[in-house]
């Protein structure tokens, strides 16, 4: 069976590099499933989980918290360039929980002062923290 090479790259380096038979990501237009021989494509990614189903006998599934970025698909090579990304096994859940609480406090404070920019920034931080928490539970 044909497989794809999947790489997730952040400013800190390569976070993931394996072969896969199926990938699921979320773009602004919704969830996108990627199979081998997918058309060439570049698309923005939302803050969301990335599901990678590896090939082979064990059918292992890897989960990665993607915090924005882009995906490029070309000739069975899938490259995700993300602001940050963490595999489920690498997520510090207590740190993510603290980030969630901090973001919720910042949203409340910004809403009382009607600071729209701070509300938006804090909501992004909250989405990122919730994404990390959700992926850690996979």
Swiss-Prot record:
Produces ATP from ADP in the presence of a proton gradient across the membrane. F-type ATPases have 2 components, CF(1) - the catalytic core - and CF(0) - the membrane proton channel. CF(1) has five subunits: alpha(3), beta(3), gamma(1), delta(1), epsilon(1). CF(0) has three main subunits: a, b and c. Keywords: ATP synthesis, Cell membrane, CF(1), Hydrogen ion transport, Ion transport, Membrane, Transport. GO terms for cellular component: plasma membrane; proton-transporting ATP synthase complex. It comes from Streptococcus pyogenes serotype M49 (strain NZ131). It is found in: Cell membrane. This is ATP synthase epsilon chain. The lineage of its organism: Bacteria, Bacillati, Bacillota, Bacilli, Lactobacillales. Its main location: membrane. Pfam families: ATP-synt_DE, ATP-synt_DE_N. Belongs to the ATPase epsilon chain family. It is a peripheral membrane protein. It comes from the Bacteria. One of its GO terms (molecular function) is proton-transporting ATP synthase activity, rotational mechanism.
């Amino acid at each position: 069976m044909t497989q794809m090479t999947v790489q997730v790259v952040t400013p800190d380096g390569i976070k993931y590099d394996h072969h896969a038979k199926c990938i699921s990501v979320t773009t602004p237009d919704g969830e996108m499933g990627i199979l081998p021989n997918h058309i060439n494509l570049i698309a923005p990614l939302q803050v969301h989980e990335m599901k990678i189903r590896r090939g082979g006998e064990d059918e292992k599934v890897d989960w990665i918290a993607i915090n924005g970025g882009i995906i490029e698909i070309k000739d069975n090579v899938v490259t995700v360039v993300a602001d940050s990304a963490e595999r489920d096994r690498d997520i510090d859940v207590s740190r993510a929980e603290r980030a969630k609480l901090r973001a919720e406090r910042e949203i409340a404070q910004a809403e009382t002062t009607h600071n729209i920019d701070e509300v938006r920034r804090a909501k992004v931080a909250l989405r990122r923290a919730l994404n990390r928490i959700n992926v850690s539970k996979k």
